[in-house]
Amino acid sequence: MLMKQIVLIVVFVSPHVLFSLSISFQVINMNVCIIGGTLEALLLAMHYQEKGTVSIFEIDAELGLPISHPGRVLNPSIFNEYFSPQQIEFLKLSSNPDGWGCRWEWVMKHMTSVAASKGVNIYPRTRVLSMEQLHDCIRVITTNNERHQPTQFDADLIISTHEESTKPGRLQHVLDESLTIPFKEQEHIPWFGGTLLTLHHPYPSMPKPALTLSRSDGQTEVWWKGECPWIPPAGYLETCSGTLSSLVDDLSFDAIVQRVSDFIHSLE
């Protein structure tokens, strides 16, 4: 039965149990809840939408905001699988030694639109309050938002892609780790990113960034591991900070697509 297969996966993937298990299952009409409005969540949602019903819960008002990821793709043709030529124009792609620079906020906007058009239920301004195992499903209780959406969801599979916030007082989802499969990534460290006009880059006093990504809109992103090491005399147009993988190779659209594919294959 479907539920027996899903429960086994949740138990053995739980971080509190040191077991390894490989289970192959084919399912249809699944109810899947994904916690966190990340790019990983959107890619997972589009995959599982083909098998049933998927709901994404995001605390913030929009998915992917505030931006905390470099606008970077290594092989821009990968976008053709997800976006129209008109949408790709919005990304402002430009070739760099570190990869193609792009506007990450538009990557997230387009991916959200594509997921919604495929039938994924997306609930912003929504926080998970609790979850409990019932006889044949996991019940998820959430807050309500201004759209008067449901606050109770029954799921066969729950995946968490969200990262714990480091902001003091910030509300968090309330998760039961024994009922949730975490989308585990590599060890995360703090990163700082700043955007400045390309005509102002580089400054002679600028320390070498770990990533430099110019875009065709006349702006350049510079990213360093750790805290902000330098501020340009004219200031930044925009700054980003958050926790990301310590490996630069992990920080691209392509790398995220590959990690999601690997994660899905590990469950099926």
Over which residues does each language-model region extend?
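Methionine residue identity
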Residues: 1-3
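Short, Lys/Arg-enriched N-terminal segments with co-localized hydrophobic residues
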Residues: 18-29
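N-terminal Rossmann-like FAD-binding beta1-loop-alpha1 element of flavoenzymes
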Residues: 31-54
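N-terminal FAD cofactor-binding segment of flavoenzymes
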Residues: 47-52, 56-91
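Predominantly flavin-linked oxidoreductase catalytic cores and closely associated redox partners
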Residues: 122-233, 254
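A conserved FAD-binding loop/helix module that cradles the flavin
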Residues: 240-267
